[in-house]
Design a protein with these regions (language model features):
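Class I SAM-dependent transferase core
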Residues: 1-53, 57, 87-104
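Residue-level signal for inorganic ion chemistry
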Residues: 20, 151, 188
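Conserved SAM/SAH cofactor-binding pocket of Class I
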Residues: 43-124
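Conserved beta-strand segments of alpha/beta enzyme cores
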Residues: 78, 103-105, 146, 167-172
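Alpha-helical transmembrane segments of helical membrane proteins, especially in multi-pass transport
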Residues: 127-131
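A short glycine-rich, Lys/Arg-flanked "PGG" loop and its adjoining helix->strand segment in the class I
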Residues: 134-146
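Conserved beta-strand signature within the Rossmann-like core of class I S-adenosyl-L-methionine
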Residues: 144-156
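Active-site capping/gating segments
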Residues: 154-192
Length: 192
């Protein structure tokens, strides 16, 4: 999928940065030196989304990477951001309201405890192994769901381990153009 951010995209990113800086002073959510690079990294996964998802979930959303930025980039998609840490979920709610993101719902809970829904896309950034993530997402996906997992240098070994258990799933590894150093994307389709 090609990313074509609207005119207000840069303004939205600037608003997000201001929200994060304000919240970070009190709650110490992140310590990124180059927030622009992290935003680009979050957006770089869009090129591996082959369809236009209607419903998507971001698991372990933390300070909004990549979930909030994918929601900004895909405004016609309904996004469900799952973050069990109350402080981080409060920030996500604050950012959602500040950015007027009507397409985002914040779930201050673990995904496995949430009300089930079928997502077209499930994203996550370096939260846990692909195998474990797919397992905790049972009830949120079917064989048509795409998993977009932001991984690091161990992606090859992780994909190999995943393929042993999910033999019918299609699992590919990609590198993004604007991703952080060592970023690999694990794209999984057909998990059952």
């Amino acid at each position: 999928m090609k990313l074509a951010p609207g005119e207000s995209f840069g303004e939205q990113v600037a608003k997000f940065k201001a929200c994060l800086q304000k919240f970070n002073r009190v709650h110490s959510l992140t310590n990124y030196d180059d927030l622009d690079a992290v935003v680009r990294d979050s957006l770089s996964g869009v090129e591996f989304i082959s369809c236009h998802p209607r419903i998507a979930c971001d698991i372990g959303s933390g300070a909004g990477f990549p979930g909030l930025f994918l929601a900004l980039a895909l405004p016609l998609c309904e996004w469900h951001l799952f973050e069990p840490n109350r402080k981080k979920a409060a920030f996500l709610t604050y950012a959602k309201v500040s950015l007027a993101l009507a397409n985002v719902k914040i779930h201050a809970e673990r995904v496995q405890d949430g009300a089930k829904l079928r997502a077209d896309l499930i994203s996550s950034r370096a939260l846990m192994s692909a195998r474990s993530l797919v397992e905790i997402c049972r009830g949120f996906y079917d064989e048509n769901t795409t998993f977009l997992l932001y991984k690091g240098s161990g992606a090859e070994a992780e994909a190999k381990e995943f393929r042993k258990e999910f033999t019918s799933a299609h699992c590919e590894i990609f590198s993004g153009k604007n991703a952080l150093k060592n970023r690999k994307f694990l794209v999984i389709k057909g998990a059952k």
